[in-house]
């Protein structure tokens, strides 16, 4: 009997669910194989270790985030880009939780893992530089305050993305609300 193939997106989706539910330390191929209804050896045909699979998953998500962020460069104002970027980051909010496991991964387990972790670090730095650049452009355009350092604004921006959506709002509505509070503040209209 031929081995069952695994669809890439199914493998990535189940990997994500297991990481979110069980954490990195409890993640293993047997559990993943059971969820995918395949033999463990089938997963080994694709990835030689959990480190390689998990970093491949992270690269896959980062590629999607980066592609969506790059598509926003066409927006006319830096403020609109910052708002739209927040929507992308909130849409993929699970990535922040999952990237917290990077220090647990043995980066020296294989050249592929080391390369993936290095790339993730570079991509994260690129996104941070993009946000910082947009902050500077928005200041120049008079869209945001220029009396606060961009590094502080960027930290507040990234912290706002991490606010848990306990009410389980649609990610678009949640992003809109968070950005509005971030941009307009908590003061009642006319009280600023």
Annotated model-derived regions:
Residues 1-22, 26-35, 52:
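Basic, helix-initiating cap at the start of DNA-binding domains
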Residues 26, 49-55, 64-65:
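Short amphipathic alpha-helical segment with a characteristic S/N-K-E followed by hydrophobic residues
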Residues 37-47:
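Short hydrophobic/aromatic patch on the recognition helix
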Residues 54, 58, 62, 117-128:
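Amphipathic, non-transmembrane alpha-helical scaffold segments
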Residues 56, 70-95:
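Hydrophobic alpha-helical connector segments
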Residues 91, 129, 133-141, 156-192:
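C-terminal peripheral helix-coil segments that are non-catalytic and often amphipathic
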Residues 92-115:
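Amphipathic alpha-helical segments used for helix-helix packing
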């Amino acid at each position: 009997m031929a081995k069952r193939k695994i669809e890439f997106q199914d493998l990535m989706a189940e990997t994500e669910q297991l990481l979110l539910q069980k954490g990195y330390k409890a993640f293993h191929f047997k559990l993943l194989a059971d969820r995918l209804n395949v033999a463990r050896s089938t997963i080994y045909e694709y990835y030689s270790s959990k480190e390689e699979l998990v970093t491949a998953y992270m690269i896959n998500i980062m590629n999607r985030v980066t592609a969506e962020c790059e598509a926003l460069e066409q927006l006319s104002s830096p403020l609109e880009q910052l708002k739209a970027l927040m929507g992308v980051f909130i849409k993929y909010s699970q990535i922040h939780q999952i990237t917290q496991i990077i220090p647990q991964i043995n980066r020296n387990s294989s050249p592929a893992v080391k390369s993936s972790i290095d790339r993730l670090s570079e991509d994260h730095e690129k996104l941070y530089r993009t946000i910082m650049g947009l902050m500077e452009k928005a200041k120049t355009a008079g869209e945001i305050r220029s009396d606060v350092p961009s590094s502080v604004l960027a930290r507040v921006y990234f912290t706002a993305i991490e606010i848990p959506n306990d009410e389980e709002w649609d990610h678009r509505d949640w992003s809109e609300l968070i950005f509005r509070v971030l941009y307009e503040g908590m003061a009642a209209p006319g009280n600023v």
